[in-house]
Regions:
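Domain-level signal for soluble alpha/beta catalytic cores
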Residues: 1-392
Length: 392
């Protein structure tokens, strides 16, 4: 017996997407959630993405809805854990995402929607691929667990710091939980974010019933819960797993009676690691300065001998002493500072979750360190003379 799942036809996909436009959706995502270079060769990927965008565009054309309609390129996780949690390289992930982005842009999408990301580093790779290949708007949505954190530990505040630092146009949460379970996550986004906050919850929690997956929240309750979060300040709302067009229709109707809350500039100074954010301005912040060769002969020796273990040991000592940030300076005239700072950033974030302060006057080294950093780093020693910050 052939148990291979039947692939949907273009007509079936168009019908489904049209039903969401008919329900009042402004944005419908292309059928490309799992489309990436790890699963398809370049020719297959281009054909798949091009067809998916064409189908969504046709669904918008056929829809009876009179609202503005947009097609978003849907990008989901690669399905690989990046180092240090897994064995996949960060730059390889950027390259894989870039392929999908390029094909989607060429096919004529209106925006890019990165969603259901459960790892901050994977999220950064996807957003970097978008930013390096298009000027289209990009929305970024992460999948949080019941503990209010991503699978690899990031808090909403940490994601706000990093994603705003990379100029995402809207940020928020989707999948994994229903709207009531995501209230705490959404409130943290609203506390820190200066860009629109988005929300696409599941239709509650799934369970198996007669061999099928069903959900425990129905359209009236769903729209009521989402409506309360719209009143708190969420500006973009939709649905994820289990949300049929009836759910979207209910949310659209509910939103008509709600006055949108203005998006406000929070004027916060945040830095972050892959787990948490640190806010400046309320109380003194303790920054460890031991990872610095100035006046430290033993540290200088470690740099010359490529002794990364000594540097990691200094980081852990300072963490145990209670510092909140780690300054990282590996500048010596005789070493390759860009290469060593890149290595130091990678190795440090594998052993500590303290945010890093990258300390260098070399713009090439700074760029390498910031690119590899899993969070939003603090920048030190860059001055305003000439073009010292031209690459930052």
């Amino acid at each position: 017996m052939n148990l291979q799942k039947k692939k949907p036809t273009p007509e079936e996909i168009i019908r489904i997407q049209k039903s969401y436009y008919d329900a009042g959706s402004n944005v419908v995502l292309s059928n490309t959630f799992g489309a990436n270079g790890l699963k398809f060769d370049d020719e297959e990927l281009e054909q798949l993405v091009t067809a998916a965008v064409k189908n969504a565009r046709e669904a918008a054309r056929q829809s009876s809805g009179t609202q503005e309609k947009f097609v978003a390129l849907d990008i989901g996780p690669l399905g690989k854990l990046l180092k240090p949690y897994g064995d996949y390289e960060f730059e390889d992930a950027v390259a894989m995402y870039a392929k999908t982005v390029k094909f989607g842009v060429a096919a004529g999408v209106d925006l890019v929607f990165i969603e259901t990301m459960n790892d901050s580093y994977d999220t950064k790779a996807a957003l970097l691929a978008v930013k390096e290949n298009t000027d289209l708007p990009v929305f970024v949505s992460n999948a949080y667990g019941a503990d209010g954190k991503l699978m690899t530990g990031a808090s909403p505040a940490a994601m706000v710091a990093m994603l705003e630092g990379m100029h995402a146009d809207a940020i928020g949460a989707n999948c994994s939980l229903g709207p009531d379970q995501l209230v705490g996550v959404v409130e943290e986004y609203l506390e820190y974010a200066s860009v629109p906050v988005l929300l696409k919850p599941n239709a509650g929690l799934p369970r198996a019933e007669n061999g099928k997956t069903v959900y425990d929240v129905f359209p009236p309750e769903f729209s009521e819960s989402v409506g309360k979060l719209l009143e708190k300040g969420v500006r973009i709302a939709g649905g994820c797993c289990g949300t049929t067009p009836d759910y979207i229709r209910a949310v659209v109707e509910k939103s008509k009676s709600i006055t949108p809350v203005p998006v406000t500039e929070k004027n916060l100074s945040l830095v972050s690691s892959y787990t948490h954010a640190v806010k400046f301005g309320e109380s003194p912040i303790l920054i460890g300065e031991r990872i610095n060769p100035t006046g430290k002969k033993r540290f200088q020796q470690a740099l010359r001998e490529n002794d990364i273990d000594y540097i990691l040991g200094e980081a852990l000592k300072q963490q145990d002493a209670g510092v909140q940030l780690l300054d990282v300076n590996v500048g010596l005239p005789e070493i390759d500072e860009p290469a060593f700072l890149l290595r130091a950033v990678r190795e440090l974030q594998a052993v500590t979750d303290l945010p890093l302060q990258l300390d260098t006057t070399d713009p090439v080294a700074m760029e390498a360190g910031l690119r590899a950093y899993n969070g939003k780093a603090m920048v030190n020693s860059v001055n305003g003379k000439g073009l010292s910050h031209h690459r930052q």
